[in-house]
Amino acid sequence: MHPAFSVIFLTTLLGAGQGLYLAMVTGQLYAVARFLPAQADQFYAVGSLVALLLLIAGLGASFFHLGRPERAWRAAAMWRTSWLSREVIVLPIVMALVFAYGVAHWFEWTQPLFQVGAALQVDLTLLLGVLGTIASLALFVCTAMIYAAVRFLQEWHTPLTVSNFLFLGAASGFMLAAAYSAYIGNPLVTFYGTWAVILTLVGLASRLAHLRRNARLKHKSTVQTAIGVRHASVVQKAQGATGGSFNTREFFHGRSQSLLERLRTVYLVLVFPIPVLLIGLSYLIGSSNLPIIAFFVQFAGLLIERWSFFAEARHPQNLYYQSVA
Amino acid sequence: MTQLALVIDLNVCVGCHACVTSCKEWNTSGWAGPLVDQNPYEGSPTGTFFNRVQTFEIGTFPNTETVHFPKSCLHCEEPPCVPVCPTGASYKRPDNGVVLVDYDKCIGCKYCSWACPYGARELDAQQKVMKKCTLCIDRITDAKLSERDRKPSCVLACPANARLFGDVHDPDSEVSIAIRERGGYQLMPEWGTKPANHYLPRRKTRMHIDPEELTRVDNPWRKEDLTDYTGEETLDDVAW
C-alpha cells in the first residue's frame, strides 16, 4: 500500500495523545490510592491540554486524507458496519472527555461527590478520568480495526494490529508524560518512565510477533485465482493503460525492498532500545533532558514504524499490476 | 431477486479495447461523469476508467497463449466495499443488484478501494470522489430506450460479441445459460465476495502444424513450373 502522511500522522498523534491522557489518569489513580504523592491539579490540567492538542493535530491530519473534507460530517452515518464511522464518533467523545477532565482539574472541581467503601472519595475528575479511559481504549480499537478489519490486506488482518496500535500509542504517551514530568521537574519521571519502558517492551513483543507472522504469511490470492487460469506460468504483458492510474499509485509504495528492510531496522532501534536506554540512563545520572529526547526519538521511530506498516501490506489487486509490483 | 451482471467470454475477447473507449465515452458525458484524463498528451498520462483490458501471457515460449482480460466492477453479491463506507455513499441497489456510489455523499476517504480485492474502484482526480463501473445504470434503466439499447455501452460496442449482459439469478437468461453450459467462473472465489460478473474460460484448441510449414521454402508455384523446356515460345517470351 502507499503510505499516506496524513494517515501516518493521524494514527501516531492520536496514539500519543490518548497515551498521554491515559498516563494522566493513571497518575491520578495512583495518587488516589496513595502510591504516589498527589500532584497539583494544574499538572493534570496541562497534561490533558497537551493530549487534547495532539488529538486535534491528529484530527487535522485526517482531513488531508479526504478528497472532500467539507463533507467529513457525513462520516458518522454507518456506525453499524464501518469502523471508520465508529472512529469518527468515538474521537470527538474522547476529545470532549479529555477537555472536560482538564477543565475540571484546572478549576479544581475536586469536591467529593460520593464515597465508595471506607476511603475512596469519588470526585468529578475521577469520574471523567474513568469515562475518558474507556473512551480512549475504545478509540484505540476503532482506529486499529479500520486496518485490521480489511480481510484482503492479510498483513493487517490480525489482532496484533490492534495490540500494536494500543501498546505503541500508550508507550509514546507515557514517554511523553515522563518527558513532561522531567521538564517541569516533578518526581513522577520515574513512575511514568517505568510504565513507558514496560509498555515499550510489550509493544516490542507485539510488533515482533506481527513481523514474524507476516514473514510467514501465505497469501490467499494468486495471479491464477485473480484471472481464473490454472497454469503455473502467467505473466502480465499489458496493464490496460500507457501511464499510471489510481490503482498503480494507491496500492504501491514505490520503494525498493532493501529500503523497506533498512527502515524496519531503523524503527526497531529508534522505537524500542534507544528510548529504554535513555530512560534508564536518566535514572542513573538524574538528567531531565534524556526523557524528553527519549520521547522524540521514539515518536520519530513510530512515524517510520507506521510508514512500514502501510508499505508492507500487499493488496490482492496488485496481482493485476505485476509490472508495478 | 434480480442480479444484473456481465459475462465475459475470454475465448472471444481479442483485446481491442473497444469496450474501454465506449465505456469512457458514454460515462464521461453521462450520469457518472466526467471521467477526466490528466496529462493526456504528456509523458505520464493518467485518468479515470471504469473498465480496463489487461493482457496476460500464459505458458512458456513457444507454447504460449495470450489472454486479454477485461476487468471492471464485478458487482459482488456480498460487496465488501459497501459495509466499510462511513457515509453510506457506497450501496447496492436492492432492485437489480448493481453496486453504485452516491457522488454527493462520498468524502473520498478511499476506504472502499482498500476493501475491494479486485481494484475495481478508482478515485477521480478531479472530482475527488470514488468512481466505478455503474453497469451503465442510466442506460439499462432508461425505459425510453429500445430493449436492444438497454444494455451497458461496453456490451454494445464489443465487435467480437465477447460480452453478455443479463440477470444471473434468472436461470433461463442468456448469461445464466452461458455460465452453466460454458463453465463460467468468478474471480478470486476464495474471498467469498460472490462476484456477479462471470468469465467464460478459453477453450482448448488443437492445431496440427506440419514441420514444413515452419521453414521457408521456394515458391511452390515455381517448383511446379519446372517443366522440361524445349525451346518453343512460352508466355515469358512474349513481348507486350
Swiss-Prot record, chain A:
List, in alphabetical order, the Gene Ontology terms for molecular function in this entry: dimethyl sulfoxide reductase activity
Provide the alphabetized UniProt keywords: Cell inner membrane, Cell membrane, Membrane, Transmembrane, Transmembrane helix
Please provide, in alphabetical order, the Gene Ontology terms of the cellular component aspect for this entry: dimethyl sulfoxide reductase complex; plasma membrane
Q: Main location per UniProt?
A: membrane
The entry's localization annotation reads: Cell inner membrane
Family membership, please give it. Answer: Belongs to the DmsC family.
Q: Which PANTHER family match?
A: ANAEROBIC DIMETHYL SULFOXIDE REDUCTASE CHAIN YNFH (PTHR38095:SF1)
| Quaternary data | Forms a heterotrimeric membrane-bound complex composed of a catalytic heterodimer (SoeAB) and a membrane anchor protein (SoeC).
Know the name of this protein?
A: Sulfite dehydrogenase subunit C
- Species source reads Allochromatium vinosum (strain ATCC 17899 / DSM 180 / NBRC 103801 / NCIMB 10441 / D)
From Swiss-Prot, chain B:
Note on how the cofactor is bound: Binds 3 [4Fe-4S] clusters.
Q: List ligand-binding residues for [4Fe-4S] cluster.
A: 13, 16, 19, 23, 73, 76, 81, 85, 106, 109, 112, 116
Q: How does it sit in the membrane?
A: Peripheral membrane protein
The record describes the protein's role as: Part of the SoeABC complex that catalyzes the oxidation of sulfite to sulfate. SoeB is probably the electron transfer subunit.
Compartments where located: Cell inner membrane
Any idea which GO molecular function terms this record carries? 4 iron, 4 sulfur cluster binding; metal ion binding
- Cofactor(s) for this protein? [4Fe-4S] cluster
Q: What is this protein called?
A: Sulfite dehydrogenase subunit B
**Which InterPro entries does this UniProt record tie to the protein?**
4Fe4S_Fe-S-bd, 4Fe4S_Fe_S_CS, ET_IronSulfur_Cluster-Binding
Subunit structure, per the record? Forms a heterotrimeric membrane-bound complex composed of a catalytic heterodimer (SoeAB) and a membrane anchor protein (SoeC).
Q: Which residues cross the membrane?
A: none
State the gene name recorded for this protein: soeB
Keywords assigned by UniProt, alphabetized: 4Fe-4S, Cell inner membrane, Cell membrane, Electron transport, Iron, Iron-sulfur, Membrane, Metal-binding, Repeat, Transport
